[in-house]
Amino acid sequence: MSEITHRTKTRPVKVGPLTIGGNNEVVIQSMTTTKTHDVEATVAEINRLAEAGCQIVRVACPDERAANAIADIKKQISIPLVVDIHFDYKLALKAIEGGADKIRINPGNIGRREKVEAVVKAAKEKGIPIRIGVNAGSLEKRILEKYGYPTADGMVESALHHIKILEDLDFHDIIVSMKASDVNLAIEAYEKASKAFDYPLHLGITESGTLFAGTVKSAAGLGAILSKGIGNTLRISLSADPVEEVKVARELLKSFGLASNAATLISCPTCGRIEIDLISIANEVEEYISKVKAPIKVAVLGCAVNGPGEAREADIGIAGARGEGLLFRKGQIVRKVPEETMVEELKKEIDKLAEEHYAKLEAEKAKAEQETQKA
């Protein structure tokens, strides 16, 4: 089973039923590609994202039609809704009134102080946080004039400026992002931000590219940041179906042991010893475990001689040979199974492990409730 890597502790901030920061796990976020005023299409996409493992979803709110749709969207989805606002404070007020769980603004772009005060007052009344979104591509003119071009120091200065506006209004339910398309700049900005303030950080490499190139670029940048214990939520930004963003995010978090609700596949790269169709089997198993909400490590290996030993860390796995497969747990062979049924046998064992995990969680939940009642 996976173990959660140590996180840099930050101030906890509530987003709907979730708590971002503190000692909580990194939360996966994505953004819809639909026109927000098209409620039916937007809800359908959000529900697809939630099924894939998305935990928070953001929608664009460029106009009043989009703002008016927030309430209808909110009623039909099961995950927290973030509304993206640029410049028009009235749209922020409508989004908050419509049930947004978080809004993303830059207070300095909203206009006069009374406009910012109105947004902060509404957010306070509803108990929702504000995300300050700093982007290297849209830094304030004064910052660019001071530094000459986008720098990590300039990005942090911008963040601190917007944070101060909110803090001066006694508002502290803040989440901050420091996005850049340049990987090295993003890494430096997030490192410096993590030392400059204790608000939770939303991670992202912006404009990262298409499915393949963007996955590599995001994994390189966000992987480096996560490895330093920095980050509380993240989005993989891709020019692709947003469901792919969620899939990549889950895999990235699993790589660092940061996902306690996802199964992981281990499979060998294939060689001349293989006597089964390992690639298609691995793909089938990967698809099967994509919906398993338990931290199980599953191995699919092509060599019965070295397979079990090579996957000692796996909770369950198969190693194929001519006409049969070896089913094993923690590197120990459990039994031999015919080749034609070995994938189905593996799936049954995966289901058993998942059920054991779910039962354990329910028992822990029941125990916690009993202790709460006693207190």
From Swiss-Prot:
Enzyme's top EC category: oxidoreductase
Record-given protein name: 4-hydroxy-3-methylbut-2-en-1-yl diphosphate synthase (flavodoxin)
Cofactor note: Binds 1 [4Fe-4S] cluster.
Binding site for [4Fe-4S] cluster: C268, C271, C303, E310
EC number: 1.17.7.3
GO biological process terms, semicolon-separated: isopentenyl diphosphate biosynthetic process, methylerythritol 4-phosphate pathway; terpenoid biosynthetic process
Cofactor(s) of this protein: [4Fe-4S] cluster
Family of this protein: Belongs to the IspG family.
Role description: Converts 2C-methyl-D-erythritol 2,4-cyclodiphosphate (ME-2,4cPP) into 1-hydroxy-2-methyl-2-(E)-butenyl 4-diphosphate.
Catalytically driven reaction(s): (2E)-4-hydroxy-3-methylbut-2-enyl diphosphate + oxidized [flavodoxin] + H2O + 2 H(+) = 2-C-methyl-D-erythritol 2,4-cyclic diphosphate + reduced [flavodoxin]
Organism in which the protein naturally occurs: Bacillus velezensis (strain DSM 23117 / BGSC 10A6 / LMG 26770 / FZB42) (Bacillus amyloliquefaciens subsp. plantarum)
Molecular function in Gene Ontology: 4 iron, 4 sulfur cluster binding; 4-hydroxy-3-methylbut-2-en-1-yl diphosphate synthase activity (ferredoxin); 4-hydroxy-3-methylbut-2-enyl-diphosphate synthase activity (flavodoxin); iron ion binding
